[in-house]
């Protein structure tokens, strides 16, 4: 069976394990903390928290979370989307697969914990460990991802200024010139320097395209 990119990226987050989970507090300000990725099944990511924590209240109130992790190869996974409280049915399995949890919540104290599932949203793989850099947007669940960055339109005059300015050499000669989206930093140098104003921001159109490996 072919494995989708999303499944691979979720498994990478599980291997990173201790990653940053971000939410919005009741006063509208951001909050971030390190949380363990407890379980990954296909395109579903599971984590847990205690019912008395602010994190729990923020998840229940907003229904959204953003997650960021970095590994030793300078590869970042970012995901954001909807979360759902799935109760305590998975607690036993989570404690089996994460035995250190027994030291933090021994015995019956585990039942203050509730499990959440991130199952619908967007994400991006981004690697600074390669030259040029690599990025890959993806979506999971019923969601689509929004195109970001820049593109060169047909009003391109072929001067090559954008290609010379690009710090990752991610722009190929042509008519018009073409930005290799998988290698683009999204820095905006080409957008700023184009004398013909032929470079535009990608307008957020959605896409479901995703490679399988």
Regions found by a protein language model. Name each.
Residues 42-46:
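Short active-site oxyanion
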Residues 11-27, 65-69:
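A short, Trp-centered hydrophobic/proline-enriched beta-strand micro-motif
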Residues 35-39:
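A short, well-structured catalytic beta-strand-centered motif of the EAL phosphodiesterase domain
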Residues 113-115, 120, 124-165, 169, ...:
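Ferredoxin-type iron-sulfur electron-transfer modules and their immediate structural context
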Residues 54-122, 128:
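Short, structured beta-strand-loop surface elements
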Residues 181-184:
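Solvent-exposed segments in extracellular or luminal domains encompassing
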Residues 161-178, 189-206:
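Iron-sulfur cluster-binding cysteine motifs and their immediate structural context
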